[in-house]
Curated annotation (Swiss-Prot):
Belongs to the IL-10 family. The keyword Glycoprotein applies. It comes from Sus scrofa. One of its GO terms (cellular component) is extracellular space. Keywords: Cytokine, Disulfide bond, Glycoprotein, Secreted, Signal. This is Interleukin-10.
Length: 175
């Protein structure tokens, strides 16, 4: 019996340590965010001109209304939905443009997943439930563009990074 009590005690302490570590990583998140955004921009760099050259459309997919949602009360949900949109709808299609492109898009996706994970761990940055109308408009326009939508969305990925930065800067000022 004493050995099982010791085991339970160790498990409990490990959980407490993990919780403290998670909280500490949130304390440092605001200082690590610029580095994470630089990594996203650097990962996008090798494919940026490829996708922007393929995007022959003049209108933006990521409009000012999306940025306003990022800055408004729907910011959390807009950010969460847009990360999911890029990871599930855009990037899998973008990977079909050749092995070299696939490698870079995959790397970009991994960095975006890491950002999403860090945001979810630090609930003050991503505590949301509501739907964003602007994100729905982006998704609808993307669908209407069919295969051209991938070039449009990937070509504007740098705008998406800027919107993430605007949202996170606003959230850090409030906290």
């Amino acid at each position: 019996m004493p050995s099982s009590a010791l085991l339970y005690c160790l498990i409990f302490l490990a959980g407490v340590a993990a919780s403290i570590k998670s909280e500490n990583s949130c304390i440092h998140f605001p200082t690590s965010l610029p580095h994470m955004l630089r990594e996203l921009r650097a990962a996008f760099g090798p494919v940026k001109s490829f996708f922007q050259t393929k995007d022959q459309m003049g209108d933006l997919l990521l409009t000012g209304s999306l940025l306003e949602d990022f800055k408004g009360y729907l910011g959390c949900q807009a950010l969460s939905e847009m990360i999911q949109f890029y990871l599930e709808d855009v990037m899998p299609k973008a990977e079909s443009d050749g092995e070299d492109i696939k490698e870079h898009v995959n790397s970009l996706g991994e960095k975006l997943k890491t950002l999403r994970l860090r945001l979810r761990r630090c609930h003050q940055f991503l505590p949301c439930e509501n739907k964003s109308k602007a994100v729905e408009e982006v998704k609808s326009a993307f669908s209407k563009l069919q295969e051209r939508g991938v070039y449009k969305a990937m070509g504007e990925f740098d705008i998406f990074i800027n919107y993430i930065e605007a949202y996170m800067t606003m959230k850090m000022r409030k906290n």
